[in-house]
Every structure is written in structure tokens, then in C-alpha cells.
């Protein structure tokens, strides 16, 4: 009988990536098949996020629902991972004693051993340590799921912004070796992946070891990834302005595979608030980066993160944020009302901004960003955009759907053989959440760059005597 695994994931793209790796790992070692139905699973895993308000209570509410399933099936294994587990592991065990496994973001690769231990002696396992890069060395060969894929290139953060729990839950910055990253991407390219999104809590801080023992820069890595045949679109997230150096900007000038879209969080337009946040950059320095980016890539569009109502934020501070939004002309944003994360310096600050002011500021900010996003979309009307075709449209099975470089969804009439390939379309209609296009060119007519085949990258980066991401043996 097939054993089944159910994973519920909250939070960032890194958590989504981690969950996909958990599924692949437990399929390879134990034969667990994913199911969307928790009631039919043999193992339930909750991959948590501690960024949002009341994250801990959300975890216990979910575990309470799963407790009912365990009462019906005592052999059911329940595991909690992610950042809340890393931060609150002991508390979870005390409050939810029926949880069998608690693991952190850096120990998910040990899940097979943890499950074996629970199956063997029914004693709970807690492992929320930070074993640096070992996690990546023991994951199975990646499996493509469509033409796009996420690839984690580093973990952790050293910036210690006063509101953020990431350094405490994922540890300090650790970069994967260059060859390991190229090996994984080449494997994905050989399976038909055309777009990769490089992931890290502070992705542009990557400083990985090269094959010759030297240390590579993030700009170097971008060019190496772009050289892999089949990888014709590269994204990365999330970046920090303090390490967005000129050599990265130069990649935008000479590497067409790097998309004309960047998510670069700024959080506030007020230098005083930025200082309280521990951001180590000013609004003017942020704008200088954007100016240089637009000199290198005039059509680049920018998105960002904003926190409103940070302790001490005045009306004048908020107005400076709104001015920055207008000056940069952001295309989109992820914006939130401040809520204190336990254990962070900001949690000890006086939360002196009235709740109504916070809500009003968030509304004003989001309305302005939405207006700017629609203006950007309208500018695309009549232009030709390159689309990576992801599949059929959600609105009509008779149409295809894909995304532009700036993440706009485009629906258009096409043929099934276009899925997983690029097409150029003319934008003929603009809607609130999507665009409509008409095909003007297929991939065969594009003359995309060919530099190095995935097979040659795999052969060049494979290490027979090392563990490596591709040869984990359960």
C-alpha cells in the first residue's frame, strides 16, 4: 500500500523550496507520495513561517486540527518545521506533546532518520541545530515541475534588522559552492526548465567557493548560470541594498537572460526609521542603486517591501516613504503593518503608532502602488513581450498562459506544443490582474543564445567521491 505524505507550507519562497525538497527526499528514501488530503496521510508536516503576526498561535491552531487525526490514527507522524519550529521548538513540545518531530530549516535533510527513529521507538525527535551547508549535500536529485524552478543558493542572514527573526531562525549566511549550484541547475535544464529563480534570505550576499578554491561573487554566478543552454530567464530574490554592488548592476547591462525586473526591499523612505530598523542604508543610497540600474537596463521595473507603523514612525516619516514610492515609481510591493516578532530588538521598542493610523497608512500606500502598477501595465499595451508559456489559462482551457519578465500574466491563443517554450506576443488588452496577447513570434524564430549544454555542465561539476546533491543514498 502506498504511503502518503501531506505538507502544509506557510511563508516565503524559500519555505516553498524547502517543502518541495522534503517531498522529493521522503519519496526517495521511504516512497512517500504527496497528497493534498491530510486525512489520508501517514506523515503530516507543517512548514512554518514566523514573519507574520500571531505566527505561533496559527501553528497551534493547525496542530489542534491534526491532533484529532492522530487520536483516530495513533501511528500518524506529525512534524513541525520551519522558522517557528526553530524559534519555539521546546515550547511546541510542551504545549503539543503529540507532535513527534520538530526540525529547523537547516535540518530538514535529516527527516528520513527522524522518521525512522519515531517509527522505531515512538520517542519524539527535536533537531533545530544549524549544521551549515550539510543540508544541501544530502538532498536528492532535483525534479522539474514545469518550465520554472527555484534553486536555493544560500541560507541565513547576517544583517540583523531590528524587526526580523531570520538570523535567529535560519542562522547566519552560508553560501553553497558554485559547482553544486550549477550542477543542480544543469539537471533542471536537462529536464526542460527554462527559468530559474535563485533563492536566499540575502541572495546577493552569496560568496560561494569555486572549483579552484577561490571565492566567487554573485555577479560571477549570474553569468555562469546564464551560460547554461536552455536557461534563458534568470530571477533572484531576496536582495539587500547594502550589497547590491556595481558588478551586479553590470550583469544587467550585458546578460539578457537576467530579467528586467528586480525585487529590492527598502522598508521605509525615512532615514530616521531606516536607522531604527537597522537597515544600514539611506533612502538616497537606495535611489542611487535604482538610478544606476536604469542606466544599465532602462526598462527595468522594481518591486519592494514596506513596513508601515514601525515604532516611532511619524506622519512626516510616512510622507517620506510615499515620496520614495513616487520617485522610484515602484511596479508592485509587499507591504505590511508592523507587528513585533518575539526575541527581536524591535519587540522591546514602544509601539506608539495608533492602530488606525497604521491601517490608514497601509491603505494609502497600497492604493498608490496599485495605481502605479496599472500605469505600468497600460504602458505595455501595443508592445511586444516575451512570454514563457507555463500551461493552459485558468480562465479558458482553449487558451495558453505565461508570464512576462515583469511577472505579468498574459493569456493568448496558441497550440499545446508551445508549453514550456518562449513566444513573443503583442499586448492587445490590459486588465487588473492580467494582460491579453496575440502571438507574433515563436521560439524557433528567436535565435536564443547557446553557450554550454546542461550535459557538459553536469559532467564538469559532478564529483564522484563527494556526496553531492545528486547522489544521496538513503
Curated annotation (Swiss-Prot):
[4Fe-4S] cluster 1 binds at residues 12, 49, 83. Its EC number is 2.8.4.3. Residues 378-441 form the TRAM domain. Residues 3-120 form the MTTase N-terminal domain. The keyword Coiled coil does not apply. Disulfide bonds: none annotated. Signal peptide: none annotated. Pfam families: Radical_SAM, TRAM, UPF0004. It is found in: Cytoplasm. InterPro entries: Elp3/MiaA/NifB-like_rSAM (IPR006638), Methylthiotransferase (IPR005839), Methylthiotransferase_CS (IPR020612), Methylthiotransferase_N (IPR013848), Methylthiotransferase_N_sf (IPR038135), MiaB_methiolase (IPR006463), rSAM (IPR007197), rSAM_horseshoe (IPR023404). One of its GO terms (molecular function) is metal ion binding. Its main location: cytoplasm. It catalyses: N(6)-dimethylallyladenosine(37) in tRNA + (sulfur carrier)-SH + AH2 + 2 S-adenosyl-L-methionine = 2-methylsulfanyl-N(6)-dimethylallyladenosine(37) in tRNA + (sulfur carrier)-H + 5'-deoxyadenosine + L-methionine + A + S-adenosyl-L-homocysteine + 2 H(+). Binds 2 [4Fe-4S] clusters. One cluster is coordinated with 3 cysteines and an exchangeable S-adenosyl-L-methionine. One of its GO terms (cellular component) is cytosol. Keywords: 4Fe-4S, Cytoplasm, Iron, Iron-sulfur, Metal-binding, S-adenosyl-L-methionine, Transferase, tRNA processing. It comes from the Bacteria. [4Fe-4S] cluster 2 binds at residues 157, 161, 164. HAMAP family: tRNA_metthiotr_MiaB. Catalyzes the methylthiolation of N6-(dimethylallyl)adenosine (i(6)A), leading to the formation of 2-methylthio-N6-(dimethylallyl)adenosine (ms(2)i(6)A) at position 37 in tRNAs that read codons beginning with uridine. PANTHER family: CDK5 REGULATORY SUBUNIT-ASSOCIATED PROTEIN 1, MITOCHONDRIAL TRNA METHYLTHIOTRANSFERASE CDK5RAP1. This is tRNA-2-methylthio-N(6)-dimethylallyladenosine synthase.
